């Protein structure tokens, strides 16, 4: 969940201030990871000794979404600490407030895949979460931020509201698997496509010329 180096060949680091997703894709690798490292059936949440709190807050304006202030501690049936998890609610959308300072703490410029463990621009994500992530990115302009979504309409809504940052270090990607799917492109923004998994054949003229309109294509 932290600012981590990655083997993904088109970025150097991943950063997950928001994780979890409700798209329900059958081929989702992130959901499998969250289920693996989230709480197991034999574990339960462990409260902080000083505050008595677990550290999980619900979002009144976004049912099914959560905020955590730190990696949540887990205990076994005897109450003994076993480990901490960044996925206390499994793959439910979760904002990790304690990770917002990570870009600033990492001085060396990096190409950062933001929220590879979820979809920051899913319709269920509160606007304030997105704004908080953008603010954290803006405070550390030495990095290039790679955003990726299956819901490009959210990009458009934010752009029309003047809330989608412009700049050479803000890249907005759309995941598509077939040539008839929607994507985001707008003048003045760095945009790209991630065609993964590739489920249908593409040509230069597919999706209204998407392969030529965007700045970059990942296959």
List the model feature ranges, each with a label.
Residues 1-111:
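N-terminal [4Fe-4S]-dependent radical SAM core
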């Amino acid at each position: 969940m932290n600012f981590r180096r990655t083997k993904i060949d088109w970025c150097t680091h991943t950063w997950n201030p928001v994780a979890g997703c409700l798209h329900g894709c059958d081929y989702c690798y992130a959901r499998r990871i969250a289920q693996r490292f989230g709480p197991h059936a034999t574990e339960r949440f462990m409260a902080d000794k000083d505050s008595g709190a677990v550290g999980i807050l619900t979002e009144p304006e976004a049912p099914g979404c959560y905020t955590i202030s730190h990696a949540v501690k887990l205990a076994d049936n005897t109450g003994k600490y076993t480990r901490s998890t960044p996925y206390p609610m499994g793959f439910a959308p979760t904002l990790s407030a304690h990770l917002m300072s990570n870009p600033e703490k990492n001085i060396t410029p990096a190409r950062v895949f933001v929220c590879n463990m979820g979809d920051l621009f899913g319709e269920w994500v509160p606007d304030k979460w997105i704004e908080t992530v953008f603010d954290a990115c803006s405070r550390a302009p030495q990095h290039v931020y790679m955003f990726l979504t299956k819901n490009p309409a959210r990009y458009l809504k934010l752009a029309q509201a003047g809330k989608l940052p412009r700049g050479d270090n803000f890249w907005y990607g759309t995941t598509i698997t077939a040539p008839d799917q929607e994507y985001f492109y707008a003048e003045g923004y760095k945009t790209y496509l991630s065609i993964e998994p590739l489920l249908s054949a593409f040509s230069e003229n597919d999706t209204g010329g998407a392969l030529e309109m965007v700045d970059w294509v990942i296959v």
